[in-house]
Amino acid sequence: MLNNKKVAFIGAGSMAEAMISGILAKKLLQPQQIYVTNRSNKEKLLLLQKQYGVATFRNYQETLPKMDIIIFAIKPKDIAETIEKI
C-alpha cells in the first residue's frame, strides 16, 4: 500500500519520532521514503537522520510537491504559521 510512497513529516519532536520509529519497525516504509523537517532544531534533524536513516529538508516549496503524504506532527498552535509557509 505504501510502496514507493514518499512521506514528509513537518515537525521532528516526540510525536514525529514515535511515528517514524513505529513505521520503520513495522516495515511500512523504508527510511529513504521518509523526509523530516522542523522549524529550528537542526540538531534534532541530524539525530533523526543518523538514528533512522531518514532524509531531512528545509525548503518546503522544493520538497513538499514531491511528497505523496504530508504529516503535520506539530502543536496545534503552530499549524496556521506552518500552513502559511506552504
Question: For each of these PLM feature ranges, what is it?
Answer:
Residues 54-85:
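Rossmann-like NAD(P)-binding element
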